[in-house]
Amino acid sequence: MRKCPYCDFNSHQADRFESNGKLPEDAYLAQLLADLDADLPYVAGRKIQTAFIGGGTPSLMSEDFYYRLMDALREKLSWADNAEITMEANPGTFEQEKFRHFRQAGINRLSIGIQSFQPNLLKTLGRIHNREEAIHAVDKSRAAGFDNINLDLMHGLPDQSLDMALEDLSLAIELNPEHLSWYQLTIEPNTEFYRRPPTLPEDNTLWGIQDAGQALLTQHGYAQYEVSANSKDNRRAAHNLNYWRFGDYIGIGAGAHGKITLVNGEIFRTRKTRHPNHYLNNLPEVLVIKEAIEQEDLPLEFMMNRLRLFETFDLKDYERFTYQSVPFSLIKACETALKQGLLDHDEWTQQRVKTTEKGKLFLNELLELFLP
């Protein structure tokens, strides 16, 4: 397996870390649990609502690894009833029996990275699966016992037409997942696409894809609740909702990120060393980096997350999640957004915030108003 040319996430080729043809599962599990022990004070007295197992293709680890990991997590953490526990999966490495064990271990939601069903686009994206494997991955997930599945699908791909984008989306809808993450390709720094930019669709085509695609999703019962997220029967991604509502989370593992709010109002982010070898070797100077969120940056940090969600929220949520009074700068920015038609006037009169349809379309311009 190799890294995809558009991916800026913390993924590394597995063959670089294999010993005698095997991943260093025992060593990695031991380091994960030591990492968790160090972060336990941050979650003391809290119920864990969700977990997300991501980073490349975590399903490459064995069934035994996940039985041991989940047993340890249940022992060390206090879990809410019906907690959502998601694993990312790659259609090109899908084994039904293995995923049946993952389900028995306690993982109850899958996020399958399909991205496209079309051979030419899959090749451009560096994906190792094909159309049939993508379809079979969903079928095998159901057979393994998963009743909560997300499909990741991309649009705005190199040389992609409106018809091609809708063909991909239509097939994804036919597979009837509970959740569809349908997001536009963005060229990120430190990726192959950034170094050698492909030819992307023109803006008019991108707008057409977005409009027609969202209409198709709505027609088939998928409600858009976030910029790129759509769910059926309110099966929204609880883990991501916590991110976007500015909730707290800990991150364990190589490259994992966390956000913690202390009772004194201090808010900081953590990130663990990205490279698995450094992580396994427990190098103290790179294992954990803590970065405080400065008070003047809080309005942007908060709104940058909350405004991704297409839901109304109370202005007092700012105080509840930041332990700070609503600053005048935030009020002023909201008033400017109201004048520009980016926020809803009726909700604002009730001290609530909601983006208008124009605000959804021009989200970047809306967020710029909250820059310090």
Question: What is each model feature region?
Answer:
Residues 2-3, 11:
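Short pre-active-site segment immediately N-terminal to redox-active cysteine/selenocysteine motifs
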Residues 8-42, 46-324:
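C-terminal scaffold of the Radical SAM
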Residues 89, 355-356:
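Hydrophobic residues in beta-strands and at strand termini
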Residues 230, 347-352:
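Short, Lys/Arg-rich nucleic-acid/phosphate-binding segment
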Residues 339-348:
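A short, conserved structural fragment
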